[in-house]
Curated annotation (Swiss-Prot):
It catalyses: ATP + H2O + teichoic acidSide 1 = ADP + phosphate + teichoic acidSide 2. It comes from the Bacteria. This is Teichoic acids export ATP-binding protein TagH. Keywords: ATP-binding, Cell membrane, Membrane, Nucleotide-binding, Translocase, Transport. Residues 385-403 have a biased composition (Low complexity). The gene is tagH. Residues 373-384 have a biased composition (Basic residues). Residues 250-466 are annotated as: Unknown. Residues 403-447 form the LysM domain. It comes from Lactococcus lactis subsp. lactis (strain IL1403).
Amino acid sequence: MNTNKVKIKAEYLTKKFELLPAKSSKNKAKSLIGSNSKNEKDFWALRNISFEIRDGECVGVIGLNGAGKSTLSNIISGQIAQTTGRVEINGDVSIIAASAGMQNNLSGRENIRLKALMVGLTNKEIKSKMDDIIEFSELGPFIDQPVKTYSSGMKAKLGFSIMVHQNPDIMIIDEGLSVGDKTFVDKSQKKMFEFRDEGKTILLVSHDMRTIKEWCDRVIWLNYGEVKAYGRPEEVIPEYEKFVQWFKKLPKKEQEKFKTDQRQAQLDYSVEELKAEIVSQNPSKSRRVQREVTEELKNKKDNHKLSLMSKVIVWLCLLAFIWITLVSLSNATLAESLRHPKTFFTERLFKSDTRNMTSTTKKEAVVKTSSSPKKKVSQAKKTTKVSSTQKNTSSSSSTSNQNTYIVQAGDSLSIIAENHGYSVEEIQQVNPGVDFSVIHPGQEINLPEPTTSANSTTEQSDGANQ
């Protein structure tokens, strides 16, 4: 009997996932708030898993694709939570999967520093281990290249090198070395044996039966979420290989039918079936365990669903958003809509905001008022020019049609004569009986009959005045 300390213990472990009918944002949102339960199907990835792993043991996990191997390793490493059952972990856990946790845009050296900081190593410890990690990884000059340029084997080497230099109590290797070359695998195997001799626990998930045989003390065979066998490699591996050979010999249709039947069993699984299995396995503890399972399910909160309080907050935020949108389409303020909601919906909703229009009109009026003096000055200048033009036009018209002139303010007989190209005597001759010693604005006087030279002189004079 093995008296070593138990490092990992799982009892009646299950993991249930909710399957949506179609992958869409609408279905995800409904599932989040819990309104899509009718369309969801329960898929039990793990069903009633129980086992123990002790100090210094290396345990392999084998099975076909979709058997639940990665789900089990993720639960043990704490990345996801189980649905029912208990998982007891005694020690620090480190997991390595092909490229797991790697930041593709960072270099290999930067990834070493990042992962070391995440597990709590100090800068001094990282610096002291950096060269050893790089040397063990065999990446050479590629250590300073971005990880996105690495092959899957190079990523596995880097991840494994980081893990073994963290010195954890429990190491989980999920297909981390299946893509590595034989030289590196042999070196890793030697390192793993050193850890095992130091009393460290190793959980190895792999499809490589050669590695499982060489590394592992015991093997767990998972078959579509159930433990098919758990024991020594020489006992379990032949049974598994026999099953694989049987499966491969089946016609394609029979293989698909087998997979469909097994997956349907995972869909049809229920808590009642779990309780029945517990009773058959251990009648003495059945009542206590059944109560524990029932309590766990009552208290279990699905990680991807919102709690009742969170749902209330989401609905309140949604209502607030809709209300604010309606207020923006009305002529009421937010405070007015809250004080008088009935009036808001019956009289104010979808009405233009007259207050804003009035405010805009007032602003425009102020702008117009402030600019009006400039406009008035401009208009006055324009009026003066028009008046002057009208005067000249009037004078010209008067000269050409009636040979008369209306005296303007500031005019004198000599100025009138000079502007129109006449002499004072010529004007006096056509205005007998008029006393030109005193003339006043508005007075009408006759001008001599225009001649060609006079007209030319008059036009030049008018142009100069303008």
